[in-house]
From Swiss-Prot:
Physiological role: Core component of nucleosome. Nucleosomes wrap and compact DNA into chromatin, limiting DNA accessibility to the cellular machineries which require DNA as a template. Histones thereby play a central role in transcription regulation, DNA repair, DNA replication and chromosomal stability. DNA accessibility is regulated via a complex set of post-translational modifications of histones, also called histone code, and nucleosome remodeling.
List of residues that carry N6-methyllysine: 21
SUPFAM superfamilies assigned to the protein according to its UniProt record, in alphabetical order: Histone-fold
Cellular compartment(s): Nucleus; Chromosome
Pfam families given in the database record: CENP-T_C
Originating organism: Zea mays
Gene Ontology molecular functions: DNA binding; protein heterodimerization activity; structural constituent of chromatin
The protein's name: Histone H4.3
Residue list for modification N-acetylserine: 2
Gene Ontology biological process terms, A to Z: nucleosome assembly
Family: Belongs to the histone H4 family.
Amino acid sequence: MSGRGKGGKGLGKGARKRHRKVLRDNIQGITKPAIRRLARRGGVKRISGLIYEETRGVRKIFLENVIRDAVTYTEHARRKTVTAMDVVYALKRQGRTLYGFGG
């Protein structure tokens, strides 16, 4: 580990910081037509106008919970990369078993 400074095992070698695009209001990324398509797939015929913001809020809370659990699994394993299995285990913990991603 000589000559690496704070880098550790070669992860993030301390090169210059890249400028990251500031992501503001990303919750709007799921569009009104996308929500409508999901509802149609679920058998919904008519949709109230208030549903769209409510759906975005519920989706945000759901993803926060899944990501929090997945990151907890990652940190417990002393890794820096969240794997598909971390997400599978996080979903299983919440009672939403997902098949097809290993394990």
